């Protein structure tokens, strides 16, 4: 069981920008399976482009709350750990994560809002409380709370889509690309305009996030990926997180319990 496991998971989601147990190695997504990012010619912002971009944004999952039960394989520099995760989201408000070992013992808990990142490390009895900009130690400063939600759900990142977004048809799929100063946002959508692949790349900072989405199932008449595989590189660390969503409940009441025991050491 590794110490500080949730701090590493939060760092990983931060690289996104956040998201130990019995060890079980899993095969990571081979490089050949990751769609290649193609050089795109800048198209004219015509009606066809606008219709496509509106359609992509229109297929984003719309919800008030989500409750997700997941199995996860976290691999940091080839050290693999299997854990269970409960993820609860209040749209544009809070992301709550509970991490348990396979024996059912909770080892960590986190509460992320647009203003703060809070972590209970039950392995070491430590409470970490940081402002949201703590994640910028790991990722580009353009990353927002909404970006984190999009990564977990496979939504297109609407905050990075504009008339400057370039489009290119690739078979039945469409590749889209937006350049934002040093950060490049690439993603691929299928015929239903659901995101299959996301890449956030900041070459100047040496940071990259790749996410693949598969196994789309209908929840409340909306297609949501149930397999999410993330691979990131930042600060000389290679991290992967393989999430398998076992159950998703939408728009129910969700509690976000977060009580700090008196015995915990507080780190700000």
Where are the language model's segments positioned?
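Gly/Pro-enriched, hydrophobic low-complexity segments
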Residues: 24-28, 165-268
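A sequence/structural signal for flexible, mid-protein segments enriched
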Residues: 126-128, 133-175, 179-182, 186-190, ...
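N-terminal leader/targeting segments and the immediate start of mature chains
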Residues: 23-79, 267-268
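Bacterial N-terminal signal peptides that target proteins for export
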Residues: 2-10
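An acidic-aromatic
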Residues: 94-145
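C-terminal motif of bacterial Sec signal peptides marking the signal peptidase cleavage site
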Residues: 18-21
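Beta-strand-dominated lipid-handling architectures at cellular/organellar boundaries
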Residues: 69, 80-88, 93, 107
């Amino acid at each position: 069981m590794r110490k500080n496991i949730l701090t590493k998971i939060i760092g990983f989601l931060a690289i996104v920008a956040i998201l130990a147990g019995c060890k079980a190695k899993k095969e990571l997504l081979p490089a050949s399976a990751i769609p290649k990012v193609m050089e795109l010619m800048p198209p004219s912002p015509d009606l066809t482009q606008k219709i496509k971009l509106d359609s992509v944004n229109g297929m984003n999952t719309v919800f008030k709350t989500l409750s997700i039960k997941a199995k996860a394989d976290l691999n940091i520099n080839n050290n693999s750990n299997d854990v269970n995760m409960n993820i609860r989201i209040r749209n544009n408000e809070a992301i709550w994560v509970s991490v348990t070992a396979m024996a059912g013992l909770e080892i960590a808990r986190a509460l992320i809002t647009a203003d703060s990142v809070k972590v209970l490390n039950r392995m070491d009895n430590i409470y970490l409380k940081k402002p949201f900009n703590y994640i910028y130690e790991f990722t580009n400063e353009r990353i927002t709370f909404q970006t984190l939600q999009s990564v977990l759900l496979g939504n297109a990142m609407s905050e990075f889509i504009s008339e400057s977004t370039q489009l290119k048809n690739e078979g039945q799929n469409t590749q889209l690309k937006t350049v934002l100063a040093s950060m490049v946002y690439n993603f691929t959508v299928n015929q239903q305009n659901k995101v299959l692949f996301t890449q956030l790349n900041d070459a100047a900072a040496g940071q990259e996030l790749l996410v693949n989405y598969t196994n789309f199932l209908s929840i409340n008449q909306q297609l949501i990926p149930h397999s999410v595989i993330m691979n990131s590189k930042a600060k000389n660390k290679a991290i992967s997180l393989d999430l398998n969503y076992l159950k998703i409940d939408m728009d129910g009441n969700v509690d976000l319990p977060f009580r700090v025991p008196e015995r915990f050491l507080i780190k700000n």
